């Protein structure tokens, strides 16, 4: 690019790497050739061989084979300059991958931890919730024993002769009537209460 100044002399403006400067252009052809060769030599000295990326604002050159941004290695230049940091980053990545793999294995091995069974999801029913729908019988109360006609007759005969039974006789009657000792004992208690009640009524009359 050429421009004419006030002294009517041609001057050339050359855009350098870090700035812009002007130089006078010679009029003769020999001087022009010398100027061209000198400019080529200076350009070769300024720009070394090999692909480079020039940044005018920061005045820093970075090799095209690798870029470094914010201290973090992007391609390969950072690894060449700082092998210890790259080794640490690689070790951290491998540890993170191993941890994620272990977590996935634990989840696969223990699916019951994450998934709750249907029994836990259903609301728990407490005894007091269904107490209103139950019978009015007290808890722990035994069912009433029903005696056959033959058993009742045999017990009445024994009560007629003996109001109170010894334990030996009570065990013998229970064995004969296919009852237990407790049932025989309760029957005789109830029968004595009834007998006393009837005797009181007869006395009053």
Curated annotation (Swiss-Prot):
Entry-linked Pfam families: Homeodomain
Biased composition (Polar residues): 102-113
SUPFAM superfamilies hit by this protein: Homeodomain-like (SSF46689)
Start-end of DNA-binding region: 140-199
Main location: nucleus
Keyword Nucleus part of the UniProt annotation: yes
UniProt-listed PROSITE patterns: ANTENNAPEDIA, HOMEOBOX_1, HOMEOBOX_2
Chain ranges for the short sequence motif Antp-type hexapeptide as given in the UniProt record: 125-130
BP-aspect Gene Ontology terms: anterior/posterior pattern specification; embryonic skeletal system morphogenesis; positive regulation of transcription by RNA polymerase II
GO molecular function, one term: RNA polymerase II cis-regulatory region sequence-specific DNA binding
Region (Disordered): 75-123
InterPro entries cross-referenced by the UniProt entry: Antp_homeobox_Deformed_sf (IPR050609), HD (IPR001356), HD_metazoa (IPR020479), Homeobox_antennapedia (IPR017995), Homeobox_Antennapedia_CS (IPR001827), Homeobox_CS (IPR017970), Homeodomain-like_sf (IPR009057)
Record-level GO cellular component terms: nucleoplasm
Intracellular or extracellular location(s): Nucleus
Keyword flag Nucleus: yes
Xref: CDD domains: homeodomain (cd00086)
Domain of life, per lineage: Eukaryota
Alphabetic keyword roster: Developmental protein, DNA-binding, Homeobox, Nucleus, Transcription, Transcription regulation
Role of this protein: Sequence-specific transcription factor which is part of a developmental regulatory system that provides cells with specific positional identities on the anterior-posterior axis.
Family the entry assigns: Belongs to the Antp homeobox family.
Record-given protein name: Homeobox protein Hox-C5a
Organism name: Takifugu rubripes
Organism taxonomic ancestry: Eukaryota, Metazoa, Chordata, Craniata, Vertebrata
């Amino acid at each position: 690019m050429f421009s004419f100044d006030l002294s009517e002399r041609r001057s050339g403006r050359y855009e350098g790497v870090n700035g812009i400067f002007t130089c006078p252009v010679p009029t003769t052809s020999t001087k022009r050739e010398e100027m061209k060769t000198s400019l080529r030599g200076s350009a070769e000295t300024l720009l070394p061989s090999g692909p480079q990326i020039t940044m005018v604002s920061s005045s820093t050159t970075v090799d095209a084979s690798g870029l470094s941004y914010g201290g973090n290695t992007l391609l390969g230049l950072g690894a060449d300059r700082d092998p210890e940091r790259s080794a640490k980053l690689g070790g951290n990545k491998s540890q993170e991958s191993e941890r994620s793999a272990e977590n996935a294995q634990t989840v696969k091995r223990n699916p019951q931890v994450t998934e709750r069974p249907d029994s836990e999801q259903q609301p728990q029913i407490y005894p007091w919730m269904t107490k209103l729908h139950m019978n009015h019988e007290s808890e722990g109360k035994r069912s009433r024993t029903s005696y056959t006609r033959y058993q009742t007759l045999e017990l009445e005969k024994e009560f007629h002769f003996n109001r109170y039974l010894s334990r030996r006789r009570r065990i013998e009657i229970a064995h004969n009537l296919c009852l237990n000792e407790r049932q025989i004992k309760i029957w005789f208690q109830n029968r004595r209460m009834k007998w006393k009640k009837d005797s009181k009524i007869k006395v009053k009359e």
